[in-house]
Amino acid sequence: GQRVGYLSWQPDKPGAQMLRTIVPSTLLSVLIITLLCLFMVRRIWTSSLSLSQSLVRLGASEAQAQHLAFHDVLTGLPNRALVEDRLTQALAAALRHDRRVALLLLDLDRFKNINDTWGHHAGDELIREVARRLSEIVRTSDTVGRIGGDEFIIVMPDTETIGQVHTLAQRIISALSAPYHLLGNELWVGVSIGLALAPKDGVDRLELMRKADIALYDAKNHGRGQFRQFEKAMDESLRTRQELAAELRQALVNFTGLAVWYQPLMEINGERVVGVEALLRWHHPTRGDISPADFIAIAEETGLILPLGEWVLREACKTSLKLPQVVVAVNVSPVQFRSSGFVSRLLEIVASEGADPQRLELEITEGVLIEDEHAARSSIIALREAGFRIALDDFGTGYSSLNYLSSFPVDKIKIDRSFTQSLGVADNSTAIIESVVRLGHAMGLTVTAEGVETEGQMHALANAGCNQLQGYLFSHAVPLTEIEKMV
């Protein structure tokens, strides 16, 4: 239990001196660690913020892509995909709740003229304005979409009455037919509308759209600027037209059943033939005689009017050589007139047949002139310089007959048969015809009256001062052999 020794430690530096050495190093280390932590925290926060912003941008891009996938770029309206989806949903809801859905297909009339005359920028502006007008007319529950260049579609869910749909269609026609003041110009278009109603016309989306399209086709064929509701007869009529188109194409292979007949143009006393009009006839092997009003329209729609028109022109050239004492008139379709190289092709045909252009008269309608006035005027001038006579057919039934007389160099006006038929029926009919005749003569034009069927009409037209008469009173269209006996 006795202490035998002890240990003693004597530091090199006393405690106070050690603290003065250790504390600064420790504080510096703590500061460095703190700064490193703050730097790391800042990097993490910055990265998080950047990631958040990237996610926001990605979300916006996805939203924009989603919008573009289902909306028209030009107008912002729903596109075909979105409209079809909403139509499918509306049809499903209508079946569940025993409601009706209306579908309207719209096609602008004469829109191509805007693009051709004023350029695509004007066309785009007009499309935007059409979209705006449509959006203002429909209900908030309706869907307005753009499904093509000048094609629009409207889905009307929960339709109460068909009268409600008809009222909307008429409002659309009125709104879209009003003038458009764009880029310093006043522009005009019309609209044709086809209607189909579910479940009456079908409960399938594709079937309903097909029937609305058939109704739209019917609206166009009845003069445009109107609406048509689908009827079963329209479907049957369309099938018949498609069959006739195929059969007409086959007939053109060797012109089987096709013939050119001629109706005489008489001098004012009805005693002498001064000209003949070439009129196409088609005798179908099983259907019999097909009305020109039917197959000519089909030929224009399908483009068959081009080879058909050339064939008629060749036949007319041959007839002009057989009947050198009269002028042979040939109708020129608007489709023909506007086709590329029309004038040069016509001159080639006449030259190849050895015909004299001065013995040929080309009949055009006002519809030819309104499409592209500058191009139409150039073509007419070229044709007249080549020796052809130009007649303005169906005068008085178009948009601005008097304006065209002063703007286009024609040789003859043909008063439409509707004015002739009104003689003795409408109080102002005689005064109208007399005014047209005076105007024509003042401009140095020949005036022909069409549709003369009675002696009374002939005398009234003679008293009005017409130069030539044409109609059933003198002769229907007959084969060339019959005309040769009359000349």
Functional labels for PLM-detected ranges:
Residues 9-30:
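Membrane-interface helix-start motif
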Residues 66, 70, 76-103, 109-139, ...:
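Conserved long alpha-helical elements within nucleotide-processing catalytic cores of c-di-GMP signaling
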